[in-house]
Amino acid sequence: ASTGLNEKQARAAGVAYDKVVTYSASHASYYPGARNMTVKTLFDPASGRILGAQIVGFDGVDKRMDVLAAAIRAGLTDEQLTELDLAYAPPYGSAKDPVNMAGYVIENVRAGLVEQHHWDAVAELPADGSVILLDVRTPGEVRKQGLLRSDALHIPLDELRGRLGELDKGKKVYVNCYSGLRSYLACRILSQHGFQC
């Protein structure tokens, strides 16, 4: 489902935009039947105003699309998305709805808490050892899906604090995981220890 501008339309219209991609459960994950949804949200990097969104998923996609369509029409910003008080009951939604989560991620990007790089830019990263591509997924995920690139260093997030000595502070670190949450947490840990992430 889609509402507002997509990337192609924004580029064609000369609209400045950035995007975040979030992965959330359709309702409280501890309640049976929750399914993942992928939410791509376009926003104005200067003001945080929401410009467009696309969602792929199953249950609850229509509900989130309606909220985002209204947010775009009302000119809401990332900060206002985080404050939306949306319906919550474990079978139907989470305390922090996928729409709220998109707002939080946009806030973090705009505040400079994390520098995001999307999956399609990984091939452009130098493979000469001048940067570190760090994979923080679990060993099981890496066994099942493989590393993003053969030169990636695998340190699961749960082990990162104890293995910081394996990383070179003189090299920029690019972090990947399955959904972005662990990459964000890893970058916060690394930044707090003097790494450029």
Predicted segments — roles?
Residues Y17-D18, A152, V173, C197:
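Hydrophobic anchor at the start of a short beta-strand
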Residues A10, L81, A121-V122, L160:
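Hydrophobic/aromatic residues in well-formed alpha-helices
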Residues L113-A127:
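A short, well-structured juxtamembrane/interface segment
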Residues A10, S179-F195:
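Cysteine-centered nucleophilic/redox motifs
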Residues E124-C177, L185:
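Positively charged, proline/Ser/Thr-rich regional signature most characteristic
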Residues S2-N6, R11-G112, L148:
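Flexible, glycine-rich terminal cap/loop adjacent to redox cofactors
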